[in-house]
């Protein structure tokens, strides 16, 4: 397990990645909006200009006039439902991304709250460190005792094995 500062750094890195992914998603998938109130301003015209390299759908068909009307009728009737579905999908994705950012922010807040801060005096922090050092010494002593006990049990088992092996070899003679 890592310490709280490392966890905090990892969470902050993840939050930055989430912000970046969210902004990228919005830039890629959202409808362009007006930059100012005048729809005929240069900035709005530039923002709504066609993207170079993207082919526009041809408005003329190769068939007769009646074919144009049926194609136009189909595209008009299919377009609103597709657009509504795309907007719904966009909104759902934005809600998901927003929820992820909120949860990560709360996790960061919890990590920050768990750090010793302004409300903890340096003396109390030193006392806490000293208490932890004493606990560590006690645990280390207990570990050494257990290692010595293990070594004694191992020697006892070895002596039992030697006695059994000696007894078996003497009984065969």
Curated annotation (Swiss-Prot):
Its main location: nucleus. Residues 30-88 are annotated as: Disordered. Disulfide bonds: none annotated. It is found in: Nucleus. Residues 67-81 have a biased composition (Polar residues). Pfam families: Med21 (PF11221). GO terms for biological process: regulation of transcription by RNA polymerase II. Keywords: Activator, Coiled coil, Nucleus, Transcription, Transcription regulation. Residues 50-60 have a biased composition (Low complexity). The keyword Transferase does not apply. InterPro entries: Med7/Med21-like (IPR037212), Mediator_Med21 (IPR021384). The keyword Nucleus applies. One of its GO terms (molecular function) is transcription coregulator activity. GO terms for cellular component: mediator complex. It comes from the Eukaryota. Residues 123-155 form a coiled coil. PANTHER family: MEDIATOR OF RNA POLYMERASE II TRANSCRIPTION SUBUNIT 21, RNA POLYMERASE II HOLOENZYME COMPONENT SRB7. Component of the Mediator complex. Belongs to the Mediator complex subunit 21 family. This is Mediator of RNA polymerase II transcription subunit 21.
């Amino acid at each position: 397990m890592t310490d709280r500062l490392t966890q905090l750094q990892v969470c902050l890195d993840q939050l930055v990645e989430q912000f970046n992914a969210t902004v990228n998603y919005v830039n890629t998938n959202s409808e362009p909006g007006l930059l100012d109130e005048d729809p005929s301003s240069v900035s709005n015209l530039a923002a709504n200009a066609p993207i170079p390299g993207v082919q526009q759908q041809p408005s003329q068909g190769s068939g007769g006039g009646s074919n144009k009307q049926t194609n136009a009728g189909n595209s008009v009737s299919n377009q609103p439902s597709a657009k509504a579905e795309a907007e719904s999908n966009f909104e759902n994705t934005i809600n998901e991304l927003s929820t992820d950012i909120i949860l990560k922010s709360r996790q960061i807040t919890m990590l920050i709250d768990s750090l010793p801060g302004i409300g903890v005096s340096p003396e109390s922090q030193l006392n806490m460190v000293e208490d932890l050092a004493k606990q560590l010494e006690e645990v280390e002593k207990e570990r050494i005792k257990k290692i010595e006990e293990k070594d004694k049990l191992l020697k006892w088992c070895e002596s039992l094995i030697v006695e059994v092996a000696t007894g078996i070899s003497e009984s065969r003679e």
